[in-house]
Amino acid sequence: MDIKAEVIEIIEELFMEDVSDMMDEDLFDAGVLDSMGTVELIVELENRFDIRVPVSEFGRDDWNTANKIVEGVTELRNA
């Protein structure tokens, strides 16, 4: 499974929301993510992709859409 598909699956599993048709929509504004959900998402991303998401690198504006999450995970996996 590629990173994009897996990120979509993680979001759907955690938040019961299919974001495949809203990849560029702000997930906070859409009510999908909130502060607690962000923590859950980070933990799951770290576990599934064997990455570490430094808090200093997790800015809401940098990780607020599914596409940005995919980009962030891709960058961290390639680091």
From Swiss-Prot:
Modified residues (O-(pantetheine 4'-phosphoryl)serine): S35
Name of the encoding gene: dltC
Pathway(s) this gene product operates in, as recorded in its UniProt entry: Cell wall biogenesis; lipoteichoic acid biosynthesis
InterPro entries the UniProt entry points to: ACP-like_sf, DltC, PP-bd_ACP
Carrier domain: residues covered: 1-77
Post-translational modifications reported in the UniProt record: 4'-phosphopantetheine is transferred from CoA to a specific serine of apo-DCP.
Swiss-Prot/TrEMBL GO biological process terms: cell wall organization; lipoteichoic acid biosynthetic process
Subcellular location: Cytoplasm
A Pfam family reported for this protein in Swiss-Prot or TrEMBL: PP-binding
Family stated for the protein in its record: Belongs to the DltC family.
Function as written in the Swiss-Prot or TrEMBL entry: Carrier protein involved in the D-alanylation of lipoteichoic acid (LTA). The loading of thioester-linked D-alanine onto DltC is catalyzed by D-alanine--D-alanyl carrier protein ligase DltA. The DltC-carried D-alanyl group is further transferred to cell membrane phosphatidylglycerol (PG) by forming an ester bond, probably catalyzed by DltD. D-alanylation of LTA plays an important role in modulating the properties of the cell wall in Gram-positive bacteria, influencing the net charge of the cell wall.
Designated name of the protein: D-alanyl carrier protein
Disulfide bonds: none
Predominant location: cytoplasm
GO molecular function: D-alanyl carrier activity
Species of provenance: Streptococcus sanguinis (strain SK36)
Gene3D superfamilies assigned to the protein according to its UniProt record, in alphabetical order: ACP-like
GO CC annotation: cytoplasm
Record flagged with keyword Zinc: no
